[in-house]
């Protein structure tokens, strides 16, 4: 069994073909393209090299795992607002889409099953976070559980400019 793994970030995109045992069979990376068409063309070139049993994607933003839509905002604005499940349906593969910081939290749970409560902070092109509560990943009602990226640091804001500059990101 070989899984296609993709990590979309604000600076770079990474791809790896991984065995069920976690062995990396192939890997590639590129600077994050300027648009969705370029990203999809590169992804297609990666996926066309072998037979895969599924696609696992790590992405910034608020991931609705039922619809495959990435909400919120990130350093890669063109990945938001449409269903990735629909976009990648032509491959005929199961797709697992998850927030990048949540992937860190899930990895910590896998490595440390005794973990009860933890906070994970991801610092890259943007800032993200995940929370482990009672031994489980906390996703939150609106898929933003643990997200620290746009946290108000000062209140009250009298203008939109003050509100934006009081947010914790960039």
Task: Indicate residue ranges for each PLM-predicted region.
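Conserved protein kinase catalytic core
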Residues: 13, 64, 106, 128, ...
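Glycine/GP-enriched mid-protein hinge/lid loop-to-helix segment characteristic of carbohydrate kinases
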Residues: 16-19, 36, 96-98, 111-170
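Hydrophobic "anchor" residues
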Residues: 24, 70, 137-138
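Short hydrophobic alpha-helix segments
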Residues: 27-30, 74, 141
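Glycine-rich phosphate-binding loop and adjoining helix at the ATP-binding site
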Residues: 33-44, 54-55, 63-117, 153-162
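Conserved phosphate-binding loops in N-terminal lobes of ATP-dependent enzymes
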Residues: 3-59, 66
């Amino acid at each position: 069994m070989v899984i296609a793994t993709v990590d979309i970030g604000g600076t770079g995109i990474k791809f790896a073909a991984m065995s069920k045992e976690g062995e990396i069979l192939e890997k590639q990376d590129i600077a994050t393209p300027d648009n969705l068409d370029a990203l999809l063309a590169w992804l297609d070139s990666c996926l066309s090299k072998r037979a895969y049993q599924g696609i696992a994607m790590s992405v910034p933003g608020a991931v609705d795992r039922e619809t495959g839509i990435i909400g919120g905002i990130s350093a890669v604005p063109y990945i938001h607002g449409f269903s990735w499940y629909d976009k990648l349906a032509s491959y005929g593969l199961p797709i697992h889409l998850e927030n990048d910081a949540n992937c860190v939290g899930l990895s910590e749970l896998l490595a440390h099953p005794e973990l009860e409560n933890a906070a994970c902070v991801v610092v890259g092109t943007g800032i993200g976070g995940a929370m482990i509560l009672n031994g489980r990943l906390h996703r939150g009602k609106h898929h933003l559980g643990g997200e620290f990226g746009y946290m108000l640091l000062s209140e009250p804001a009298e203008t939109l400019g003050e509100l934006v500059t009081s947010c914790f990101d960039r």
